[in-house]
Amino acid sequence: VGNILAAANAVIENNDERLGKNLRTDAEAGDKIRYYSAFTDLEEAQFIVDETKALEREGWDLDEIAVLYRSNAQSRVIEQSLFRSGIPYKIYGGLRFYERQEIKHALAYLRLAVNPDDDNALLRVINFPPRGIGARTIENLQTASNEQGITLWQAACNAGAKAAKIAAFVRLIEALRNQVGQMPLSEIIVGILKDSGLTEHYKTQKGDNQDRLDNLDELVNAAIEFKPEDSNFETLPENISDDPAFPILAFLSNAALESGENQAGAGEKAVQLMTVHASKGLEFNAVFLTGMEEGRFPSEMSLAERGGLEEERRLMYVAITRARKRLYITMAQQRMLHGQTQFGIVSRFVEEIPPEVLHYLSVKKTAYDSYGNTRQTAAPKDKIINDYKQPQTYAGFRIGQNVRHAKFGTGVIIDAVDKGESARLTINFGKQG
């Protein structure tokens, strides 16, 4: 529709070397693009859930709703929110977060930390990353296991000092076991990624290595956010909460649930999740374009490459034009990155869109996110449309803008009153308040 094409054309016009002409349409202007600045990535995901439910109530088919993101790792929080809300979804052209190879490897080490007799987990990682334990050696362990009626772990422990590489693997797992109950879950996972060599292995690989590293970082973020007390206790043994391994067991149980058979089956209508790259050639009635922060889209890497920004802008053009009727653009002012809370600012691509084709969603009442900080939540659904408005400035500042204070560090403007020299700002500095 007209507003969507106007936004796409306005963005691509900022490229010096443009290919082709602007797209035109005889259709009406249609809905304005809905822009929502969430305080956290968790709130951003919940907004997507709430809007998807509203669209479904209005008669929109789920398979005509798509969620786009710049990198695969961004899907984890969105998947989690859709799963917990019972909204069926599919990952187009990829795997669910907990089904990705690098995540399965990391979780296999975590499983061995609480149960070294898990043969499947041991077989997955005994020689991954490669540590010189060949197929013949593994076959010998399996033979010993079968003949003596013992687990592969017990066979590995019995291999003796002569089997130096197996002995080194045994020491690695023993070291992980000693951390259980002594360290937070997230720190144990960080240790696994480092001590197992997983992170270093993927750093040396070509192709999609950065995607895999980003996913491993996101696994650490998931562990930081995870609350064992919110687990599905039906999948865990009785009285497990007193076990030192409880946080790990609960996390593994949660991961198994989210990677199970809950993804929509063949022929079932479901929300489509995909990267912007994967969306090329596809169109949907409603599209959520998420993670629209500087350094994320455009990506930080592209900003350092010659021609990278223009390529990212072409991708933005693709993303916008995937929407036939309705487009949502969302960002999070706060995300977990490398295990730390990071503040973000709105993408330059959003600022290149003409204000007249945007509706800005106001942020409403205060609540708490799982990072332990106060945040803002959106107005009820029936008030959303009436609460969209153009951004106002206060003494040169605007709500949602990131600012830096000499004492308190970086913060986000979450409220403002009055204008000019009498303007007063409310700023969230994370833990500083």
What role is predicted for each listed range?
Residues 86-96:
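Conserved RecA-like helicase motor-core motifs
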